[in-house]
Each structure stands twice: as structure tokens, then as C-alpha cells.
């Protein structure tokens, strides 16, 4: 649960001393310096640099005036000399100092034929309206415009609009690689690119290539080298203008002050009319290597790695460590433009720091955007094929292939696999100055996160450490020395894993316990943690790791970790591995004093015996298994509402101090999803020394097993705890099946179908109705009173609806049991997963779903069958059952034919090739030939089953242990997407370095299509439940993981509700929306209140910007109120609040930056709340922080009154379920974000809103009420013998899973009141009244069983469960009995 975190992160007073800075802090915190009197121009420049906190809410407060260079005034000898004005726009600031130096030198020449005025803009500055006006004003009298690397669409369009107006008037317009819209502005004499994308000439065809920007860049560089020589001898003006364009590109890529001087001279004399025929001489471009090796102390750039190594070996300035032949070698990837422009101070600092720490370096650079070739050419021994390096650190921040434009991740991954070393991607600040970054609670600018954090992750990049800042005056990069020191130390620590022997390596395995209780040690989603640890350690032992003393069984391992052997009496403590006295703690933990604000002096009362800090766990040889301390606020979550800057407690800090400084781990392995380290307070992305995750993890390489279906929180762990996240499989899914009365109902329906025409129909229907009522189905299916005479068609309809409901229960997928690392599912266990993979159409691969193929066989469309079944049409329900059973049968037969007698998959590819194309011998055809679907399309079936064969191989593959060992050996772990393997089988096999997706790539077209279907069904359902009226407002939740899995479906739902559509740019990135006309929409625009999870906020800040812009755009549309509820409510709220319409239209809310969850779940899980109002206040206090697209750099700002007014208009609340693995009661996130009862309290009429859940876990997407979904969840999981017996097979951890479902059910009662009494009654009958079950639970995990009993009593005490006094008395007796049993165990 990402609920383990704090309130807004604020830098404590003493923290500034810790912040990495290359120079005294005041030298770049310029806004805090008072200008001297009469400072004149210096004052204007100082005023141009304002602190972000006091700024206008944009990220960069630097003004372009710092980049304005004008000819010196008062030079009498140069009066009357023409003035040439040049305006340039660039992505990054490294050209600023080089351009400035070039222009100043030109203007200082006493014989100059022209005076140059140059002003530069960073593209991101153009978001600010005042700056944009200045830009347009500068263009109005400019001679020349230059643009480079303009790849952000909304800003590219602003540049295009401004330059286009002046293009014909200007003397020259030069745009170097940028978006096509801007490239078309190019104009140099007769040379133009206005037809870019349409011309047939090779030159333009080159620019059209978009599929591989790395290849594009390489081709560009070759063209730049050769074309001027060819064009020089062509007589036409057009050829000469094209030649000068290419020369311009050479000068620009050369980047040095000399090159830029000659560039400006060439353009001025060639194209500025006042200078035609002037005596201006310019030299040819000085060409640097396109790619090579650069070292600041080397005499030259090297194109041959052997030459570089020879020079390196003969250096006399090196320390003794560097002369050691076994010294680690770090490869560095650098941007050529920083080197040629002389903006390389940050690179020099990293190289010097690595060498000072005893690591050799090979710093490589490339001029294009493709580093895959240079990494092979310079970092790999051409003879042996082995890498020269032990780790690679990219200092560019960009993806390895493609830079900020179009990436080629497969090409990058192939190159990195050949290197096979850890790959770290560190970041220089691009869009912020150092001061702005330090002051920002968000951390990095969202555009930088998208381009330089998210994209490198797709290559397998780790550890986004900010190592360089930017000077606001000069634009030059400077090293942040503490960050550089950490980056270099961590890189060397990863490299050491490559060099150390297995026997000497030390590993700290960290497990979690949440909520804090002995019954919860080893908490992790879907994972049997101790069985998995035991499996891992057995394997590591075989490999040569020292795990001395490991017990003989996983059960014994649990006992040794969770029981304190030294306790004289019952102890709540776990096994104590180390007692750390306060003096030792303070001397080893540099930030210990900062924790005292929240926790007082150490040792405190958490993980402490009053004198020492206690580290819980157990050591086996060189492996330590430790229990991560809890966040600390669990027992009193209300404290978080009043604590200004939450922090970890002393015990938490002591744990990580022990791991790094005392145990001296070579690596830490966080075991399972998930702990609280990555959710500690600090910047969202791009942390500073003052951020707690950064301080806690220190310099230890972090490997983290994370559930494959949770890429969003895995990404938070990757970014905030510098983790190499390795995915593990969730347990194989099975169909829920039927039991007890539900099974009896199924049999009665079969009887009705065969006997309904024999006269026994009415009698059987009467039995069906009474049995359905006994099964509590009467709330889901409207049933008549028993004994009422029904005509045949009504009998069919009632039976059809009951049949559809039990089919829905029977076919629901549920994970059974818990996964064990190193134990992939057998082939037969994978059948249900394959059936669900086969149930989806995949039009992009021309694969038809199996239900679709079978429905077509009998002349039906599968969507029509789904709809008919939903309505209870008996014939359609029966046909759907036949299709479902035939699908399962065909796939089961196929799987059986690909496995050996042990149930293992053997050589699927060969077996498939022997099956395919042999008609009736194809196993799926053999099975279908016995059904009504005998004529199914063979070709479509072959295509589908070929795909399913590949999926089967992936499902049963076992890479989880292998990838862990690769990481421990300092090798590269292949990256892969996280998500739902049913929607996206590329998630498989697990064991990949899990990543999310390009945040600017969503929502996709497919997601938009699915979203429309769900929104239309939701609105229709609400109209039915609401007297035919549309809801005016829907309050909904956006989750990070869901949007990754579905490529933005719920994001697209919001856009469709308010009636806008996303618009993708040339590169497929979505940064813009446009309104859909009311005619096309066919309904009013629905108002929304959007609660973004903290993880969504971290991962998709660009999409929050998009949503806020969309809502405000809709509020400002001139439309009737009855057709635009956004505008209607915004106008009402503007009047009530006394604010502008735009501000009143604030609808995008989340936690404060660095904070997660409403903490309602913490309160429920720990039973630490008094009444529901307290929970609602907690929700409002923590979730009322708004995002403002007009001030994106301001972070999340508290707007509680706006939040309350918006919620008060909600007619419905809404959430999405997108995966069969996680449902409403599986995790506490869902009820933690549910505002149903809160909305009822805020509404003026006091009416409870309708509550809906969209279920897209199957091809037949549904919209159900919340209460329907809770009932379905209870029937298929908590009360289902198949599910709870599957959990009981996992022993200790299985009991905890059962208890967790009941606790989460109570959570839903607390926030929504949508849990029926019978659910608690049946749960009590199942787990308490059944004596055998009760004994099993108590014996297997008495601590979790105690919590189960306590939760039943709490449900009754809070009025959620009405039951007999006899039941309650039994529970009270049981509670005493289990307390005694626990004391007996511990004594």
C-alpha cells in the first residue's frame, strides 16, 4: 500500500547544510541577494532570476534577458554599422555561453562590418505568457531566427505561430532537428522546407524518416559531412543555398565559439541585404569527431579505444588505486554538444570523482542521438567481445537511442545486453536552475521526467540521480558535488558486484510487516515470502553464496525470524539481530538529528528497548534477513494531518544504517510488493540530499522483487529508492467455480432447460426462485414472490437472469494461493490465463478472439451475445455458456498436447509446427468437432493458437531467480513492461527489470475506444437508476497502475465525460485536447471531480496538466448550462468563492507532493478511528490538493473549499477494475479513495450518490453498482472454498490473506455503507462457526486469526453487522482463547 507516507514534504531548517552544491549556496541562490544601489543593468538581470517559490508557478523563472547580447553603445567609430538581430530557441542551455562568447567577440572587433544583437530563449520559457510576448516582440525586428531540438508539441506550435508571421520578412530562418511543424519554417534564400514531408527528393525523404531517429541522426551526420562538397560545384542558387544550410548545421553541431562566430558571419553576409558585398570573411567549420572518447586531461579526442587506453596507462597524474589492474572501470556516456560548446564542468567533476575513488573511466560521446554503436565500438574489446567496463553511467539523461525525439528501445536493449553491465542514467537539470529544483516539492520538471526519466527506464536505465545544476545567468552546467559523490559511489558499488566472488558478497534481504504485527511479517502482494526466500537461498547456496546456518524448512525460517529466543515471557518483539546504542546510531546516521522534530531524541519508543535501537532479523552466513520497521504513524494516523514534515523514525533510520554501515551489505534485496522506503517524504522525482529515501538507501545497490502487475508503484521504487525492480508472477488464475447453493442453482437451471416444456417448468422455476433467495441473489436479480403464477416468457427471463448471474460468478477469474519465486505455474495451471488471453480481439496483430470465432460459426456477433446474456435472454445465456465451455475445452486439449507426463511444457514451437495445417489432427479442431462449432474458421484458429503457444511458453518460463542472480553478479537485467499479462502478454516472462510506459503516449486510440463504451454504459445505467436524468457530476479515481495496464483507459473516460478528445502529435505523444461538438456528443458535458492517486501524480503529471487544461477549456466554452455541467457548476462556485471562472473550474486533485493516500486505510487496518466523520476529515485534509495547469511548477496547492464544493455536486462516484488479479477487497486502496458517504454529507439534499464500478477484466465489460461488485467479490473470494482453501495451502501467509479480505470489507462499510449484512454472517459461519476451519486458522497463524476475530467484533460494534448475541459471545471467548494461545507459543 502506498499509504505509508506523509504530509507535504518541506525542507527542514537544518537540511540546507546537507544539500549538494558545487559552490557556497549563495552563489546560485541569486534571488536572495539584494542588488547594490545603482547596480543598473545588473539589477535588471538579478530581477530576471526569481525564486520558483515566489514565481508565477511555472518551472523556470529565468528570463531571456540573461541571454541578450547587444553591441556596445557609444562606439563612435562604428556608428552607422548595420545591426543584425538574431533570435534563437533551444531545448537546453549549453549553447548559451558559447553563443554569448561568440557574439561578444564579434562585437568587440573594431573593424566589424556589423553589430550583432542576439537573444536566446529556452523552449520551456515560452510557456510563460509575458516571456512569449517578449519573444514575439523580439521576432518583429529580427533578421535571423535559429531553432534547435524543439520537440514539445504545444511549445513547437507556439514557436511556429510566432515565427510564421515574420518568416517572409526575415532574412533567414534556420531550424535544426525539431518537430516537422517547426522544420517547415526553414528558409535560406531559395532553400525552403515548407513542403517537408511531401517532396520526393532524397534530401526531404531523409527528413521524413521517423521510425528510427537514431538512424535518422546518423544519416544526418553523414549528409552533413559530404553534401557541401557535392553542392559546391552545382551552379544553381538553390544548390548553393542548400549547401549553406548544411554548412550552418555543421557550424551549429560544432558548437564552439569559433564555429558559431563563423556561422553568424556566413549567414549575415550571405542573406542580410544591408551586408551584401560587405568585406566579411569566414572560415570553414572546425569539425570534431562525430563520436569518440574524450577525457579532460587527454591531448585529443580518440576514435580508437586502444589508443585511449594506451594514453590512460601512461598517465603520470594518477593515484595508486588507478594503477591497480583490478580497479573497476566505469563507462560514461556524454553529450557531444556539451563538450564542443565548452559546457563540460559537470562531466569533468564526475570523471575526477570516479578517479579519486579508484575507478578508471572511459568517457564516450556521440554527435547523433544513437549511442548503441559507440557503446559497442569503445566499451567492448573487439577481439574477445568482452566489455572493458564493469558499469555504464549515462550523463546525458536521454534514452540510449533517439534522444528526445523518437526512440528505438529494442536497439538500445540489444546494445546493453552485449555490454551486460549495470546501466545508470543520471540527470543534469535542463528546465530548472539549481535553486528552482532545490525549492521544488515536485523535484524535476514534468517534461524532463517524461524525456529523461521515463524513456531511459524503457532501456533498463536505473538511478535517476540529479548530478548537475544550471547557473541562471550563464546557463552553464555545474556539478552538485554531494550528488556527484553519491552517483560515483553507487556506480562503483554496482561495478564491485561484477568483480567480487559469490562467497564474499553480503546480501541483506528485507521483508515487510504491515500492519505491524507478528502475524504480518513477510507481507507482499500475491507472494509466499518465506517460501520464496527459502527457495532463493537454497539456489544461492548451490551457486556458492555463504548462507551458513540456513534451517531445513521454510517453516523453521519463519520461526527463527519472528520469535525472540531471548524473551523470558511473551514478547511482541521479533528476533533481535542487533542492538544499536544511541551514540553509535548518531555517529553513523548523518541525518539523525533531523528526525528529532517528529520523534524526539533517540532511541524513541519504536524498534527500541528504551536504551538501544533494535534491528529485527536473523543472519545466515553472509545473508541477513531483516524486517523493515513500519512507517511509524500506523497507530495514530491523525498525527499526519498536523505534522508539517513527516519523517522516518529513529528505528527506521537505524535499520538502514545497520544494513549499510554495520552489516556492510553489498546489495539489499527488498522482497515483494511493497515496503515504505520508497514512499518516505521527499521530492517526487529527482531527489536531493534532503529527501529521506535518498538518505536511507545511502550507497547500497538496491534490488527489489515487485509484482509484475504493479508497474506504477514499481516505478516509484525505481525512482525514489534507486531500485533495480525485478518482476514476479502473480499466482495462476482459475475460474471461481460454484459451491453450495450456487451449485444447486446451476443444476436446477439445467433441469429447467430440459424439462420446461413437459409441464414441470413452473415447479422448477419456483425452486430456482427460493434457492436464489437463500443464496442472497435477490438484490442482484429482481425475483417475484414465491407462488406467483408466471407466463412462460417471464419464467424464461427470470431463469435467464439467475443463470447469467451464476455464470458471472462461476467464470470470474481469481488467483488461487500465493506465488513462490522459482516455481512457475504448470501448463494446466496456465489454462485459465490462456482462456482469458484468447478472449480478447487483438486487431493490431490480426488475431480474433476465440469466443468471436465461435460466435461467427453460428452466425452471431459475440458482442450481441454478451448483451443478450446481460439482459437475461435465456438462449443467449446458454449460447455464451456453450462458447465458454468450448473455448476452455479447446485450449485445455491444446495445452495437454504440448506437455509431457509431468505436466511440463516441452518444445512448444516444434509441437505446434507438427500440429498446424493438419486439419482434424489439430487438437483444438478435434475438440470443437464434438461441439456445435465444428465449422469454425480454421485459418483464424491457427493464427490464434500459434499466438497462444508463444504465450504458454512465456507463462511457464522461470526467469525470476535467474534475473536476481544476474543483478547480484553486476549484470544487465533485461527491461520489460509491467501490467496485466492477459491484456499484454509482453509482460511475460517475469524476471524483467519492470518499467511503466512513456507517459506522453496515453491515452491510446484503443483506450479511447474502450473508454467511450464504458462511459456510455455508465451514463445509461445512472439514467436508469436516476429517473432518466444524466448525472451532473461524477467523482472518480485515477490510478497509476490501471492507466499503465490499459494505456490510459480511465484517463480517456474522464476526457469523454467532459466531451473532449486527445490529439496526438507527429511522434504519437498526447499533450493537447480539442472539444467534441455537442452535436457529436449527443448529451450534456458531465462535470467531474478527479481524485488522482499519489502514484498517478508522480508518474503522470503531464496528464494531470492535460486534464486540468481540458476541464478549464470546457468551462470556458460558450454553451448553455443545461448542456455543459462543468460550466454551470464552475460559474456557481466562482460566485460563491469570489474567484475567476478558471480557478473555480479546478477539478484535478491529489495528495500534497511527496504524500500518498488518504490514510483512511491506515486507520481501518489498525482500528485506530472513532467515527466515520474522522475518516471523512482525513480524506478531505489529505486529498484536497489541486493541480493548476496555469502554474505547473507550483506543485499541489491546498484548495479544500473548492474540493468540497465540487464534491457536493456529485450524483455518482466511480472507480475502475481492470484486472482479475486485484478486486475491491483484495487491497485497501479502493475503499481508501472512496468518497461515497463523504459526498452524501456534503450534498445540500443529503442524498447518497449512486456508486459504480466499471469492470473491464473480461472482454464483456460491465458497469455494476458498488454493492453488486462487493457481493460478487465476497462470493468469488472470501466465501468461496476454492479461494480460501487455495490460500490455506500457503499456510501462515494464507491466513493473513483471509483476514485482510475481511478487514477491507469493513473498510467498504465505513466509507460507503454498501456491504450487505449477509456477507458478514456467511463469513462468520465459514471461518468461526466451522470448528475444523477455526482450529486450522488458529494453529496456522494465531496472530492473524486474532485480528480476524477482532475485525468481526469491530464490524458488530460499529453497526455494520447485525448478529445474535450468541455469535458475539462466542467471538469474545475466542479472542481470549487465541490471546492465551499466543502467550503459550511465545512463553
Curated annotation (Swiss-Prot):
It is found in: Plastid, Chloroplast stroma; Plastid, Chloroplast membrane. This is Magnesium-chelatase subunit ChlH, chloroplastic. Its EC number is 6.6.1.1. Signal peptide: none annotated. The gene is CHLH. InterPro entries: BchH, CobN/Mg_chltase, Mg_chelatase_H_N. Involved in chlorophyll biosynthesis. Catalyzes the insertion of magnesium ion into protoporphyrin IX to yield Mg-protoporphyrin IX. The reaction takes place in two steps, with an ATP-dependent activation followed by an ATP-dependent chelation step. May be involved in the plastid-to-nucleus retrograde signaling. Belongs to the Mg-chelatase subunit H family. It catalyses: protoporphyrin IX + Mg(2+) + ATP + H2O = Mg-protoporphyrin IX + ADP + phosphate + 3 H(+). PANTHER family: MAGNESIUM-CHELATASE SUBUNIT CHLH, CHLOROPLASTIC. Coiled coil: none annotated. GO terms for biological process: chlorophyll biosynthetic process; photosynthesis. The magnesium chelatase complex is a heterotrimer consisting of subunits CHLI, CHLD and CHLH. Its main location: plastid.
Amino acid at each position: 500500500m502506498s499509504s505509508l507516507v506523509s504530509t507535504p514534504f518541506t525542507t527542514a531548517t537544518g537540511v540546507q547544510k546537507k544539500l549538494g552544491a558545487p559552490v557556497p549556496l549563495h552563489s546560485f541562490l541569486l534571488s536572495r541577494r539584494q542588488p547594490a544601489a545603482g547596480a543598473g543593468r545588473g539589477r535588471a538581470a538579478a530581477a530576471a532570476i526569481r525564486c520558483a517559490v515566489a514565481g508565477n508557478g511555472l518551472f523556470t523563472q529565468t528570463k531571456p534577458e540573461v541571454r541578450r547580447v547587444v553591441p556596445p553603445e557609444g562606439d563612435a567609430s562604428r556608428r552607422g554599422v548595420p545591426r543584425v538581430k538574431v533570435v534563437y530557441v533551444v531545448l537546453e542551455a549549453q549553447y548559451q555561453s558559447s553563443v554569448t562568447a561568440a557574439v561578444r567577440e564579434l562585437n568587440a572587433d573594431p573593424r566589424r562590418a556589423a553589430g550583432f544583437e542576439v537573444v536566446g530563449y529556452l523552449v520551456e520559457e515560452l510557456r510563460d505568457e509575458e516571456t512569449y510576448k517578449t519573444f514575439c516582440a523580439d521576432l518583429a525586428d529580427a533578421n535571423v531566427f535559429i531553432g534547435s531540438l524543439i520537440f514539445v508539441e504545444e511549445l513547437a506550435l507556439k514557436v511556429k505561430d510566432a515565427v510564421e508571421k515574420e518568416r517572409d520578412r526575415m532574412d533567414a530562418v534556420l531550424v535544426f532537428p525539431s518537430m516537422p511543424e517547426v522544420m517547415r519554417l526553414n528558409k535560406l534564400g531559395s532553400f525552403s522546407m515548407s513542403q517537408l514531408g511531401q517532396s520526393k527528393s532524397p534530401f526531404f525523404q531523409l527528413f521524413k524518416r521517423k521510425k528510427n531517429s537514431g538512424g535518422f541522426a546518423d544519416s544526418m551526420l553523414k549528409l552533413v559531412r559530404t553534401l557541401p562538397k557535392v553542392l559546391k560545384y552545382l551552379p544553381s542558387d538553390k544548390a548553393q543555398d542548400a549547401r549553406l544550410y548544411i554548412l550552418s548545421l555543421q557550424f551549429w553541431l560544432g558548437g564552439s565559439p569559433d564555429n558559431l562566430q563563423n556561422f553568424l558571419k556566413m549567414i549575415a553576409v550571405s542573406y542580410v541585404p544591408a551586408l551584401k558585398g560587405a568585406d566579411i570573411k569566414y572560415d570553414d567549420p572546425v569539425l570534431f569527431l562525430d563520436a569518440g572518447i574524450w577525457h579532460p586531461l587527454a591531448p585529443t579526442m580518440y576514435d580508437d579505444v586502444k589508443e585511449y587506453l594506451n594514453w590512460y596507462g601512461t598517465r603520470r597524474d594518477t593515484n595508486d588505486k588507478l594503477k591497480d589492474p583490478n580497479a573497476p572501470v566505469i563507462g560514461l556516456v556524454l553529450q557531444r554538444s556539451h563538450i564542443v560548446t565548452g559546457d563540460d564542468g559537470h562531466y569533468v567533476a564526475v570523471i575526477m570523482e570516479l578517479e579519486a575513488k579508484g575507478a578508471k573511466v572511459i568517457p564516450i560521446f556521440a554527435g547523433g542521438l544513437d549511442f548503441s554503436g559507440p557503446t559497442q565500438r569503445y566499451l567492448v574489446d573487439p577481439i574477445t567481445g568482452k566489455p572493458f567496463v564493469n558499469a555504464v553511467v549515462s550523463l546525458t539523461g536521454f534514452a540510449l537511442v533517439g534522444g528526445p525525439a523518437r526512440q528505438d528501445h529494442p536497439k538500445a536493449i540489444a546494445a546493453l545486453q552485449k555490454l551486460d553491465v549495470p546501466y545508470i542514467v543520471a540527470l543534469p537539470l535542463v528546465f530548472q536552475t539549481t535553486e528552482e529544483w532545490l525549492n521544488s516539492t515536485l523535484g524535476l520538471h514534468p517534461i524532463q521526467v517524461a524525456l529523461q526519466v521515463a524513456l531511459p527506464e524503457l532501456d533498463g536505465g536505473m538511478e535517476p540521480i540529479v548530478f548537475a545544476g544550471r547557473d541562471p545567468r550563464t546557463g552553464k552546467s555545474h556539478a552538485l558535488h554531494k550528488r556527484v559523490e553519491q552517483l560515483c559511489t553507487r556506480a562503483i558499488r554496482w561495478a564491485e558486484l561484477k568483480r567480487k566472488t559469490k562467497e564474499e558478497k553480503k546480501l541483506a534481504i528485507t521483508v515487510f510487516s504491515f500492519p505491524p504485527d507478528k502475524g504480518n511479517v513477510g507481507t507482499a502482494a500475491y507472494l509466499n515470502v518465506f517460501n520464496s526466500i527459502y527457495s532463493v537461498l537454497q539456489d544461492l547456496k548451490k551457486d556458492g553464496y555463504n548462507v551458513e546456518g540456513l534451517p531445513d524448512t521454510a517453516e523453521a525460517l519463519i520461526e527463527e525470524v519472528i520469535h525472540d529466543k531471548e524473551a523470558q515471557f511473551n514478547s511482541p518483539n521479533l528476533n533481535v539481530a542487533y542492538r544499536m546504542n544511541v551514540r553509535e546510531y548518531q555517529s553513523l546516521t548523518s541525518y539523525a538529528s533531523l528526525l528529532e522534530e517528529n520523534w524526539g531524541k533517540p532511541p524513541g519508543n519504536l524498534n527500541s528497548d528504551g536504551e538501544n535501537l533494535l534491528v529485527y532479523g536473523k543472519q545466515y552466513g553472509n545473508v541477513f534477513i531483516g524486517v523493515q520497521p513500519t512507517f511509524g504513524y500506523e497507530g495514530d494516523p491523525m498525527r499526519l494531518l498536523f505534522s508539517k514534515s513527516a519523517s522516518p523514525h529513529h528505528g527506521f533510520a537505524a535499520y538502514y544504517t545497520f544494513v549499510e554501515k554495520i552489516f556492510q551489505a553489498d546489495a539489499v534485496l527488498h522482497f515483494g510488493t511493497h515496503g515504505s522506503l520508497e514512499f518516505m517524504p521527499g521530492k517526487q522525482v529527482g531527489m536531493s540530499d534532503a529527501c529521506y529515501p535518498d538518505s536511507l538507501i545511502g550507497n547500497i545497490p538496491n534490488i527489489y522483487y515487485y509484482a509484475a502487475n504493479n508497474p506504477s508503484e514499481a516505478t516509484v521504487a525505481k525512482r525514489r529508492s534507486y531500485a533495480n525492480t525485478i518482476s514476479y508472477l502473480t499466482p495462476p488464475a482459475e475460474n471461481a467455480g460454484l459451491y453450495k447453493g450456487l451449485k444447486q442453482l446451476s443444476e436446477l437451471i439445467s433441469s429447467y432447460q430440459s424439462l420446461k416444456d413437459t409441464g414441470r417448468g413452473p415447479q422448477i422455476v419456483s425452486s430456482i426462485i427460493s434457492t436464489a433467495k437463500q443464496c442472497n441473489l435477490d438484490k442482484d436479480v429482481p425475483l417475484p414472490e414465491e407462488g406467483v403464477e408466471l407466463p412462460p416468457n417471464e419464467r424464461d427471463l427470470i431463469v435467464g437472469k439467475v443463470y447469467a448471474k451464476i455464470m458471472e460468478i462461476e467464470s470470474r477469474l481469481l488467483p488461487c494461493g500465493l506465488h513462490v519465486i522459482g516455481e512457475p505455474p504448470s501448463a494446466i495451471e496456465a489454462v485459465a490465463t490462456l482462456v482469458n488471453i484468447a478472449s480478447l480481439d487483438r486487431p493490431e496483430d490480426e488475431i480474433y478472439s476465440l469466443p468471436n470465432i465461435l460466435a461467427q460459426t453460428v452466425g452471431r456477433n459475440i458482442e450481441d451475445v454478451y448483451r443478450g446474456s446481460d439482459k437475461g435472454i435465456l438462449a443467449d445465456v446458454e449460447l455464451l455458456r456453450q462458447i465458454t465451455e468450448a473455448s476452455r475445452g479447446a485450449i485445455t486439449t491444446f495445452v495437454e498436447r504440448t506437455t509431457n507426463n509431468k505436466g511440463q511444457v516441452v518444445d512448444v514451437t516444434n509441437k505446434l509446427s507438427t500440429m498446424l495445417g493438419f486439419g482434424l489432427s489439430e487438437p483444438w479442431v478435434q475438440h470443437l468437432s464434438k461441439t456445435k462449432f465444428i465449422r469454425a474458421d480454421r485459418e483464424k484458429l491457427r493464427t490464434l493458437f500459434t499466438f497462444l503457444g508463444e504465450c504458454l511458453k512465456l507463462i511457464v518460463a522461470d526467469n525470476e531467480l535467474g534475473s536476481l542472480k544476474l543483478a547480484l553478479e553486476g549484470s544487465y537485467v533485461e527491461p520489460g513492461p509491467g501490467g496485466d499479462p492477459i491484456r499484454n502478454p509482453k509482460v511475460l516472462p517475469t524476471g524483467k527489470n519492470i518499467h511503466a510506459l512513456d507517459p506522453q503516449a496515453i491515452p491510446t486510440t484503443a483506450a479511447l475506444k474502450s473508454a467511450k463504451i464504458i462511459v456510455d454504459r455508465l451514463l445509461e445505467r445512472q439514467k436508469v437508476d436516476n429517473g432518466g436524468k444524466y448525472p451532473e457530476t461524477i467523482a472518480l479515481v485515477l490510478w497509476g497502475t490501471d492507466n499503465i495496464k490499459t494505456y490510459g483507459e480511465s484517463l480517456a473516460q474522464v476526457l469523454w465525460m467532459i466531451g473532449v478528445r486527445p490529439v496526438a502529435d507527429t511522434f504519437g505523444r498526447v499533450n493537447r485536447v480539442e472539444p467534441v461538438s455537442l452535436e457529436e456528443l449527443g448529451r450534456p458535458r458531465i462535470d467531474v471531480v478527479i481524485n488522482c492517486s499519489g502514484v498517478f501524480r508522480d508518474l503522470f503529471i503531464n496528464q494531470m496538466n492535460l486534464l486540468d487544461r481540458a476541464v478549464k477549456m470546457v468551462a470556458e466554452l460558450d454553451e448553455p448550462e443545461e448542456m455543459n455541467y462543468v460550466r454551470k457548476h464552475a460559474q456557481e462556485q466562482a460566485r460563491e468563492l469570489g474567484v475567476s471562472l478558471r480557478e473555480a473550474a479546478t477539478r484535478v486533485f491529489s495528495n500534497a507532493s511527496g504524500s500518498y493516500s488518504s490514510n483512511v486505510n491506515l486507520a481501518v487496518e489498525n482500528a485506530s478511528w472513532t467515527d466515520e466523520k474522522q475518516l471523512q476529515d482525513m480524506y478531505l485534509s489529505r486529498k484536497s490538493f489541486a493541480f493548476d495547469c496555469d502554474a505547473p511548477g507550483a506543485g499541489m496547492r491546498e484548495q479544500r473549499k473548492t474540493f468540497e464544493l465540487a464534491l457536493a455536486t456529485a450524483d455518482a462516484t466511480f472507480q475502475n477494475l481492470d484486472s482479475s488479479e486485484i478486486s475491491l477487497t483484495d487491497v485497501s486502496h479502493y475503499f481508501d479513495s472512496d468518497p461515497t458517504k463523504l459526498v452524501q454529507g456534503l450534498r445540500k439534499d443529503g442524498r447518497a450518490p449512486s456508486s459504480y464500478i466499471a469492470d473491464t477484466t473480461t472482454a464483456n465489460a460491465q458497469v455494476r453498482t458498488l454493492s453488486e461488485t462487493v457481493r460478487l467479490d465476497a462470493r468469488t473470494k472470501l466465501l468461496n472454498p476454492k479461494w480460501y482453501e487455495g490460500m490455506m495451502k500457503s499456510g501462515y501467509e494464507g491466513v493473513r490473506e483471509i483476514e485482510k479480505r475481511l478487514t477491507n470489507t469493513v473498510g467498504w462499510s465505513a466509507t460507503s455503507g454498501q456491504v450487505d449484512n449477509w456477507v458478514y454472517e456467511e463469513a462468520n459461519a465459514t471461518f468461526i462457526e466451522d470448528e475444523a476451519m477455526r482450529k486450522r486458522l488458529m494453529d496456522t497463524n494465531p496472530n492473524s486469526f486474532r485480528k480476524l476475530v477482532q475485525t468481526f467484533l469491530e464490524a458488530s460494534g460499529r453497526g455494520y453487522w447485525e448478529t445474535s448475541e450468541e455469535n458475539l459471545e462466542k467471538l469474545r471467548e475466542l479472542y481470549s482463547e487465541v490471546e492465551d494461545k499466543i502467550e503459550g507459543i511465545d512463553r
